[in-house]
Curated annotation (Swiss-Prot):
<keyword id="KW-0694">RNA-binding</keyword>
<dbReference type="Pfam" id="PF03147">
    <property type="entry name" value="FDX-ACB"/>
</dbReference>
<dbReference type="GO" id="GO:0009328">
    <property type="term" value="C:phenylalanine-tRNA ligase complex"/>
</dbReference>
<feature type="binding site">
    <location>
        <position position="464"/>
    </location>
    <ligand>
        <name>Mg(2+)</name>
    </ligand>
</feature>
<dbReference type="Pfam" id="PF03484">
    <property type="entry name" value="B5"/>
</dbReference>
<dbReference type="Pfam" id="PF03483">
    <property type="entry name" value="B3_4"/>
</dbReference>
<dbReference type="InterPro" id="IPR004532">
    <property type="entry name" value="Phe-tRNA-ligase_IIc_bsu_bact"/>
</dbReference>
<protein>
    <recommendedName>
        <fullName>Phenylalanine--tRNA ligase beta subunit</fullName>
        <ecNumber>6.1.1.20</ecNumber>
    </recommendedName>
</protein>
<dbReference type="InterPro" id="IPR045060">
    <property type="entry name" value="Phe-tRNA-ligase_IIc_bsu"/>
</dbReference>
<dbReference type="InterPro" id="IPR005147">
    <property type="entry name" value="tRNA_synthase_B5-dom"/>
</dbReference>
<dbReference type="InterPro" id="IPR012340">
    <property type="entry name" value="NA-bd_OB-fold"/>
</dbReference>
<keyword id="KW-0479">Metal-binding</keyword>
<feature type="binding site">
    <location>
        <position position="455"/>
    </location>
    <ligand>
        <name>Mg(2+)</name>
    </ligand>
</feature>
<dbReference type="GO" id="GO:0000049">
    <property type="term" value="F:tRNA binding"/>
</dbReference>
<keyword id="KW-0963">Cytoplasm</keyword>
<dbReference type="InterPro" id="IPR002547">
    <property type="entry name" value="tRNA-bd_dom"/>
</dbReference>
<dbReference type="InterPro" id="IPR033714">
    <property type="entry name" value="tRNA_bind_bactPheRS"/>
</dbReference>
Amino acid sequence: MKFTLSWLKDHLETTATVPEIVAAMTMAGLEVEHVIDPATKLAPFTVCKIVEAARHPNADRLQVCQVDTVDGRKEIVCGAPNARPGLTTIYAPIGAYVPGLDVTLVEKPVRGVVSNGMLCSAAELEYASESDGIMELEGSLAVGTPAVDALGLEAVIDFEVTPNRPDWLGVAGIARDLAAAGVGTLKDLSIAPIAGTYPSPISVTVDGEACPAFAGRYIRGVKNGPSPKWLQDRLTAIGLRPINALVDVTNLISYDRARPLHVYDAHKLSGTQISTRLGRHGEHGDEHLIALDGKTYELTPEMCVIADANGERPIGLGGVMGGESTGCSEDTVDVFVESAWFEPIRIAQTGRTTGIASDAQYRFARTVDTGSLVPGIELATKLILELCGGEPSEVVYVGEVPAAPKGFAFDPDYVGQLSGLAVTPEKTHQILAALGFDVVLGSPWTVTPPTFRRDVEGKADLVEEVARIAGYGALPSTPLPEVPRAVGGILTAKQARARAARRALAAAGYAEAVTFSFTNRKTASLFGGGQDVLVLANPIASELDCMRPSLLPNLIEAAGRNARQGFADAALFEIGPTFHGDKPADQRTVVSAILAPKAPRGWDKAAQGDVFTVKADLLALLEELGAPVASLQTAQGSASSWWHPGRSARLQLGPKAVMAEFGEIHPAVLKALDVAGPVFGFEITLEAIPEPKKKSIKTKPAFSPSALMPLTRDFAFLVEKAKAAGDLVKAAAGADKALITAARVFDVYEGPGVPDGFKSVAIEVVVQPREATLTDAEIEALSAKVVAAAEKAGGKLRS
């Protein structure tokens, strides 16, 4: 949003300078982006007068001019066709930077004649986009007058408008806030109604869903043409291109009062009725409109359409842009002025669908003051009559705008309670009244927001209004209270585990990925998700329409993208939430990792990773997280459907206490995701890891190694092929925890001597005597315990 100081002074009686205005705006919450001051870039340029102009001796199209300048009389070579004696124009001295040409002037001969400066065009000063010759100014201007003063240029303030303050999209709204902040006195913003002299020959019908309210007025006998200089200068200063008086009036009011309007050429209308309705879908597709920008747009049933010819011919996109067929030109004689209120969400969606980002669309999408329909018509009528003449009809008003905001109770003491500011009730009343709020004093007060402040919905909003105008700089400096450090740190157990997992996996060579919390519904269904309650109503992209049931699909797709870019060897992990329903309890925090090994180009072709690699990384990570790894059961063949059934397993404390799953991703899943395999991975549910027992505050005794040598005993057991060797190892190690310090598999054999359907698992058991060397009888008794424990686990000692 841009405006000039002189424009602001149309609504604000003030002596403040631009820097003071900018400072006050910043303190009041208006975020100033920058100030465009033409005096800076045009400082070297001044008014001059051509005294003589003679043809250049060496060039037919050039003239050698004698020019009176601020630096005295100068000889300047000029190629402009309108250079002539007596012309008052703009002079640029040697050394001046010409912004429109992006050059700095140097003294040099032009076809043999030295030019001591330059005579400038409007385009060269960036005063206009194009020009046919040097500038022609009023002859009464004194030589040496700064170009900025001669052209009436002034600083332009550009600031960012927050979505909740559409009233700031008009200069009058800015003036209101600055007046409340004490920068000046707000002038009367009311608009006197203009009586119509005849009934409007154009009637209006509205579809409340498309356009809740519509005001219009017929004005006959106008004389359209270029706008006066003051209006053109005002629009040009903020970057708008003047078109003609009728159109420029609507643009002025849009920026002056944040009230978009539209003007129709009444003679180009078909019939005597204008209708607002939703777009229609016919036998041959949706309707189309050629808009004022010359482009053709498809009108869908979600859009508001302005139509004539008994509602059959679209002539505009309501709240967005008018149609080319009814646009005003210099030949326009009779007009119909539109001032309507459109539903903001519909206008925002129309803008996104069509790609139109007009000033009207920008304002209606943020909501326009519902109380400005008739005042907007009256102001437009006043300006049109002043600039174009004509005779107005009575105002046509149909429909109903949303109800005005309701009042609510407010205690002025709440300002101090919530903000800490010491503001008297009298000052609070003064601020709220200056901002346009209706305040009824009492116990408590009753405060009603104005129609242009629908963002104010409660007493906390009122405190914010008072605080920003009173000034946050008035807040007393109060140090924060000292908070004792939390015992055991400030992280929860889950947060601490997530941090530990992140460090451990990074140390193991995995790279962390951060992906979206949603995925494609079809992809989610591959991983046990995709339920209706998890589908997004308004996804950020069509391929991200469902909350993720697992971190694995996003990681696998990331590995696939890396592979397509030439980085096939991927080791990725992510820590984040997964979603299994619409209740808070259905959200779980998960640690997932994948390994997509690529076989090196060597003679052995061995890939750098497999199921056992990710299992080892998984167990190491669980150990780091404090999980009871020694108590975990490996349940093979019971993992989820997205794992390879023969190359995956679960780690669990019991059938209902599943802690993690690992293995190779099912080839069918990889094919559906268009990712080359194999891909291995694991997934840990942090909530499934039991909380560690409180550590004893007693100091552990110093390590005291045994003075006796350990001994080993080997056992070979027959077990079914499907039996996990780890079960035998765990059973053997637990046979006598006082003496057995370790047990491990050193051989697995299948072949002659082993029955079909069985395998031989050889286990080495390490025995560490504590107090005395074990006798043969004690060793035999210990061996018997190992055999008995193995038999309970399904093993049979080979004879």
